[in-house]
């Protein structure tokens, strides 16, 4: 089984721009057979066939000539809390990852380690012994801010700051050029190089082989993949409930059963539904029935007993 290799991204960006804490590199998934299926020819098939690789930020260097291997050895050194440190840093900086910006691949080469002279050796297809060694793949990228048209226009302005425009038309003027390679030109080139820095990202690939057929590179902004927001039901405590909420189970009281109240309400409803004549006759019946009710309540057999008392 082929050993896992480390892939490295070296991103050139302006010093004033903010670096992304992680980059997602999408490339075509490697297939064992040479013939592609018909499903992969569609857009949905290409999305399923794409493989996303997350590269983590290692360090930022000032020059492209600085070696990458010492930084990788420092990061890939066995440590018990290395994975926790990376996840903690990603979780802390996930909200600050910038959404804008594009990344364009400049070059890709494969380094197989450091030679005795201290220089990095590159992979050659005709060297099978070198191919068997465990090295890393280095990809150079450049961070382009804004749209391609704006970026190209900005590059033209920075390359020729003396251009004069009239109604968006470039004017032609004559000037005497003493020397194009004078100290002023070299100073501008040095200042231009000082305005850029290089961010080093790494990915310890778990699958054998090299990264090829790159589809896109974008900042890592999926915060829900870094932080697990799924909360189990047993993790919800009673202290977190809002007692003033109407939907709280504490505010649900059982309804008291009152038969007398129901009968009184039914009687008043029936009385209100009667007309004036019916109400008058009902009052007479109630008044004539009142002595009989009193006799029954006090235990008298006849009205004479009530008069004798």
Swiss-Prot record:
The keyword Oxidoreductase does not apply. It is found in: Cytoplasm; Nucleus. Residues 106-118 have a biased composition (Low complexity). Residues 233-245, 254-263 have a biased composition (Acidic residues). It holds the Pfam family Iwr1. Residues 101-134, 233-287 are annotated as: Disordered. It comes from the Eukaryota. Keywords: Cytoplasm, Disease variant, Epilepsy, Neurodegeneration, Nucleus, Phosphoprotein, Protein transport, Transport. The modification Phosphoserine is found at residues 302, 308. One of its GO terms (cellular component) is nucleus. Directs RNA polymerase II nuclear import. It is linked to Epilepsy, progressive myoclonic 12: A form of progressive myoclonic epilepsy, a clinically and genetically heterogeneous group of disorders defined by the combination of action and reflex myoclonus, other types of epileptic seizures, and progressive neurodegeneration and neurocognitive impairment. EPM12 is an autosomal recessive form characterized by onset of tonic-clonic seizures and/or myoclonus in the second decade of life. Affected individuals develop cerebellar ataxia associated with progressive cerebral and cerebellar atrophy on brain imaging. When transfected to S.cerevisiae cells, able to partially restore polymerase II mislocalization and cellular shape in IWR1 mutant cells. This is Probable RNA polymerase II nuclear localization protein SLC7A6OS. It comes from Homo sapiens.
